[in-house]
C-alpha cells in the first residue's frame, strides 16, 4: 500500500546511532529486540512498552507505573507478585496479559546465553507463572530486591522488551525477523506501527487505536510520523540539523554543537545555548586496562598513570569547558550524590585527584623504570607504551590526555578504529576509554561491573571488560546485591567496597559524560530541558516514547514553512 501524506510539521525525523545503521540500515528486514549488536534502536526500544518507566532527571527520580499497576515482594525478596493494568492491547487487538510477561521471561531463559538478557533471566528466575491474565508470580533463585527495577523498568538502555506470546510462541526466538509490514508485524503495544523499512529509511505512523488513548490512560502523541535515517559522519549531521532536515541527531562534539547553535536560531539543547550543551548521561568514562596483562596488572603502575593526569585540563581544553571531571565511576545524579558525597575521608587516603608527576616518577623508579634520552620511561631497552583504544566521540579530550601521559614519561598514543569495541571486549585493547552503564539510583550497579564473574581471559569477549578480580570486593558486592536500596546498610557496604576498589584503582576515572543532543524547535516544541526534565532525549534509549508523547507542534498543521 502507498503511504498516506503527512506534513513535515507533523513528522519527527531522527538519525540512527549504531554501527549496524552506518550509511544504511543493515537490519532493515528485522526488528528483533534481543540480538546483541545486530539490531538498531530504531523501533523496538520505544514500541514494546515496559511495566514501569524511571526518570533519573526529575526532582524525585520518579518511577511511573505503565503496563504494571503495582508489584510486591515477599520479605526475603525471593518472590514477586506483579499486577498488570487492564485494557492494555497489542497492535493486532489481542489483550496484553501476564501470560506475555511470563512467556518472555521463560523464552529468554530457554535461549541463554545467545539472546540479550537471557543470561540474567537464567541466573535469577526459578519459575515464572501467570496466575490469571492480570497477575504474574515470579520466584527467584536468590534474593534480589532490585529485580523489577533492573529488568522491567525502562531507563537509559535498561529494560527487557516484553513480546506477544501469541506471535512469538510458534517462532524460533534466535532467528525470527519479527518484521512483515504487510502482515502488521511487528506486533507491538506502543502508539506507532511500522509502515516502511528499507536500507535507506524507516517510517512509523501513529496508531489511532493505541490502548492508552482508548482507555483514557494517555492521549495520542502529536507526532504523526517518525522517520529514522541512517547514521552519517558528524559534519553531515551538522549540515542536516542546520537545514532543518533533522529534528534531532546523535550526540555531537562541543565545537559542532556550538556551530549549530550559532547558525540556526531555532535549535537548543537540554542546557539551552549554554555549556555543557546537553545533559549528564549515566556513563562516566574511565581509562581502563587489561588488568590481566603486564604491566597494567600492578595497582601501583595504575596509580602512577593516575598521578600523571590533570583532569581539570581535560575539561578546560579537551571539552572546551563543556563538562565536569570525576574521581569516582558514578554519574552525578542527585539520588547518587547522597552516597558519593560521603567519600571525602576515603579520597584523602586514596587521592585520585592528585595530579603529581613527582609521585608518578617516584613509583616508576621504584619499579625499576628509568627515563631514556627522550624522557620516556624505559626498562631493558623497552619503553613503557600505552596505546589507548577509543571511539570517535572521544576525540575532543583524548589528545589532551595522551599529551599529559607523554609529558609524564609514558610513550602514549591512541587509535579510533571500527573494531574498537571488539578489541576492548576481547581484551586485545591493553588500554581503552569506556563508560559505566551502571548506577542510576544506587551504587550497586556500577560496582557490579568490576565483579570477577565478568572476567574472561584475553581473547574471550565479555560485556564488562575491566578484567580485575578481588575476592573481598566480590563478597561485598554480592552482599550489596541482596540489600534493599532503602536499607541504610547499603551505604556502609558501599564504603567498604570503595575501600577495596580505590587502593587497587582497576580503572582511572576521568570525566562525567554528556549527551550533547541538538533539539530543533522549527517543527516541535516542549522539548525536555534542565527546566522541564520530563525525560532525557537520547532517541536510542528505552524511554524515547516519553519524548514523543511530550512534544508539541510548533506550527498549525496547514502551515508550510520553507525549510531553509
PLM region spans:
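Short, well-ordered beta-strand elements
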Residues: 9-22, 69, 79-82, 104, ...
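N-terminal lobe/hinge region of extracytoplasmic solute-binding protein
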Residues: 12-75, 106, 187
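Detector for C-terminal structural segments
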Residues: 16, 39-43, 198-202, 206, ...
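Gly/Pro-rich hinge or "lid" segments in bacterial periplasmic/extracellular proteins
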Residues: 42, 48-49, 53-58, 155-220, ...
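Aromatic- and charge-enriched surface segment that lines or borders ligand/interaction sites
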Residues: 69-114, 131, 137-139, 237-240, ...
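Surface-exposed binding/hinge segments that line
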Residues: 83, 119-171, 522, 530
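Ligand-site clamp/hinge motif
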Residues: 85, 180-181, 210-261, 402-403, ...
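Extracellular/periplasmic solute-recognition and catalytic clefts
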Residues: 108, 115, 127-128, 195-205, ...
Amino acid at each position: 500500500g502507498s503511504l498516506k501524506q503527512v506534513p513535515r510539521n507533523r513528522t519527527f525525523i531522527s538519525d540512527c546511532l549504531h554501527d549496524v545503521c552506518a550509511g544504511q540500515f543493515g537490519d532493515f528486514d528485522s526488528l528483533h529486540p534481543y540480538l546483541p549488536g545486530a539490531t538498531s534502536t530504531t523501533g523496538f526500544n520505544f514500541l514494546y512498552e515496559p511495566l514501569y518507566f524511571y526518570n533519573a532527571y526529575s526532582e524525585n527520580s520518579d518511577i511511573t507505573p505503565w503496563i504494571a499497576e503495582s508489584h510486591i515482594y515477599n520479605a526475603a525478596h525471593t518472590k514477586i507478585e506483579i499486577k498488570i493494568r487492564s485494557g492494555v492491547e497489542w497492535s493486532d487487538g489481542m489483550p496484553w496479559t501476564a501470560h506475555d510477561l511470563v512467556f518472555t521471561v521463560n523464552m529468554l531463559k530457554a535461549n541463554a546465553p545467545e539472546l540479550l538478557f537471557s543470561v540474567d533471566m537464567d541466573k535469577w528466575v526459578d519459575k515464572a507463572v501467570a496466575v490469571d491474565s492480570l497477575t504474574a508470580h515470579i520466584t527467584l533463585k536468590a534474593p534480589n530486591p532490585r529485580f523489577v527495577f533492573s529488568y522491567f523498568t525502562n531507563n537509559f538502555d535498561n529494560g527487557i522488551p516484553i513480546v506477544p506470546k501469541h506471535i512469538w510462541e510458534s517462532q524460533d526466538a534466535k532467528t525470527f525477523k519479527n518484521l512483515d509490514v504487510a502482515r502488521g508485524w511487528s506486533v507491538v503495544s506502543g502508539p506507532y506501527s511500522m509502515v516502511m523499512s528499507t536500507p535507506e529509511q524507516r517510517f512509523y505512523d501513529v496508531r489511532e487505536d493505541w490502548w492508552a488513548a482508548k482507555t483514557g490512560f494517555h492521549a495520542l502523541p502529536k507526532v504523526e510520523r517518525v522517520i529514522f535515517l541512517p547514521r552519517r559522519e558528524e559534519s553531515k549531521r551538522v549540515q542536516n540539523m542546520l537545514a532543518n532536515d533533522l529534528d534531532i541527531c546523535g550526540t555531537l562534539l562541543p565545537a559542532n554543537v556550538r556551530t549549530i547553535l550559532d547558525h540556526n536560531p531555532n535549535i537548543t539543547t537540554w542546557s539551552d545555548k549554554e555549556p555543557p550543551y546537553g545533559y549528564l548521561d549515566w556513563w562516566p568514562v574511565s581509562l581502563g586496562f587489561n588488568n590481566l596483562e603486564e604491566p597494567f596488572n600492578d595497582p601501583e603502575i595504575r596509580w602512577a598513570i593516575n598521578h600523571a593526569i590533570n583532569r581539570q585540563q581535560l575539561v578546560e581544553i579537551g571539552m572546551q569547558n563543556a563538562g565536569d571531571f570525576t574521581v569516582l565511576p558514578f554519574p552525578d545524579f542527585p539520588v547518587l550524590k547522597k552516597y558519593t558525597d560521603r567519600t571525602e575521608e576515603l579520597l584523602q587516603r586514596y587521592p585520585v585527584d592528585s595530579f603529581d608527576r613527582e609521585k608518578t616518577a617516584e613509583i616508576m623508579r621504584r619499579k625499576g623504570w628509568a627515563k631514556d634520552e627522550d624522557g620516556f620511561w624505559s626498562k631493558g631497552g623497552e619503553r613503557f607504551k600505552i596505546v589507548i583504544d577509543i571511539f570517535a566521540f572521544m576525540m575532543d579530550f583524548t589528545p589532551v590526555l595522551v599529551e599529559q601521559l607523554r609529558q609524564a614519561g609514558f610513550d602514549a598514543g591512541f587509535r579510533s578504529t571500527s573494531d574498537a569495541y571488539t578489541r576492548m571486549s576481547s581484551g586485545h585493547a591493553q588500554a581503552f576509554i569506556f563508560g559505566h552503564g551502571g548506577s542510576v539510583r544506587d551504587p550497586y550497579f556500577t560496582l557490579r561491573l568490576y565483579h570477577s564473574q565478568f572476567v574472561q581471559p584475553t581473547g574471550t569477549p565479555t560485556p564488562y571488560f575491566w578484567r580485575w578480580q578481588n575476592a573481598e570486593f566480590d563478597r561485598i558486592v554480592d552482599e550489596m546485591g541482596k540489600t534493599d536500596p532503602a536499607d541504610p546498610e547499603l551505604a556502609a557496604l558501599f564504603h567498604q567496597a570503595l575501600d577495596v576498589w580505590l587502593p587497587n584503582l582497576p580503572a582511572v576515572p576521568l570525566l562525567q559524560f554528556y549527551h550533547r543532543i541538538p533539539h530543533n524547535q522549527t517543527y516541535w516544541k516542549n522539548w525536555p530541558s534542565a527546566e522541564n526534565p520530563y525525560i532525557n532525549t537520547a532517541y536510542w534509549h528505552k524511554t524515547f516514547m516519553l519524548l514523543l508523547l511530550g512534544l508539541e507542534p510548533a506550527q498549525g498543521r496547514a502551515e508550510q514553512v520553507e525549510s531553509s
